Amino acid sequence: MDSENFKQHLKKLYSVNNGKVKITNEIVKFTQNHSEPLHQVQKDLINYTNTNFESNSYMLTDGNQNQFFTLLLKVLNAKKAIDVGVYTGLSSLSFALSMPDDGKVTSIDCVRDYEECCHLHWKKANVDHKINLVIDNAKNHLQKLIDNGESGTFDFIFIDADKDSYDAYYELSLKLIRKGGIIAFDNILFFGATLVDHDSKKPEDQIFLGCPSFQRMVDALKLLNEKIANDERVIKTMLPLSDGITLVTKK
């Protein structure tokens, strides 16, 4: 091998996007196809959601995320998990499929709109007995778990719900997660909006600045991002996977 030519070639490659792969839909599909395959019922649930709840299907947990969580829960040997923000049940399904038969997922949502869809697919995958669907205010139920003596007993907690409450969920989850367990926050980049300043004049940023209710959620996420980044109680990492995920474990 011509080592000098090889080095020059690498320099040229590095000069394009600083040597990083630009994440396109083609790249995402490639990585999904070369990761642990989704269970057939996961695929069925994705299709069912896209067909029957098209207007809200953007709330589905990303396929790459589900593959990532499958591996993560296996590494953790997880037997107890909490899913805050259930929607049509895909994330809870993924967690239950990754657990042994005596594993338990506490799935919390504040609406019953998708309850039938959840149970339909959980039963189809033979994991319905592992999942306890709780229709309640998530902050209230997390506190109930603490009051019932379950602090420090959960292996994995996934937060994908109302962004205004993320900070409250964080503090409650820190009490519930065991040492060595992981708390995961979804949508931490929020379409890229958490990188945009309020006073930005860039044309491409204006789409993020025209809706007060959206901006309120963005502000809550920005505060949480800074809080976690500077929180000495935890070890943390933020990943640009899908809409952004932050993983946290207690020191």
From Swiss-Prot:
The keyword Acetylation does not apply. Keywords: Metal-binding, Methyltransferase, S-adenosyl-L-methionine, Transferase. It catalyses: (E)-caffeoyl-CoA + S-adenosyl-L-methionine = (E)-feruloyl-CoA + S-adenosyl-L-homocysteine + H(+). Its EC number is 2.1.1.104. Induction: Down-regulated by phagocytic stimuli. The keyword DNA damage does not apply. GO terms for biological process: methylation. GO terms for molecular function: caffeoyl-CoA O-methyltransferase activity; metal ion binding; S-adenosylmethionine-dependent methyltransferase activity. It holds the Pfam family Methyltransf_3. Disulfide bonds: none annotated. Gene3D superfamilies: Vaccinia Virus protein VP39 (3.40.50.150). It is an enzyme of class 2 (transferase). S-adenosyl-L-methionine binds at T61, D83, G85, V86, S91, D109, A138, D162. InterPro entries: Cation-dep_OMT (IPR050362), SAM-dependent_MTases_sf (IPR029063), SAM_O-MeTrfase (IPR002935). Belongs to the class I-like SAM-binding methyltransferase superfamily. Cation-dependent O-methyltransferase family. CCoAMT subfamily. This is Probable caffeoyl-CoA O-methyltransferase 3. The lineage of its organism: Eukaryota, Amoebozoa, Evosea, Eumycetozoa, Dictyostelia.
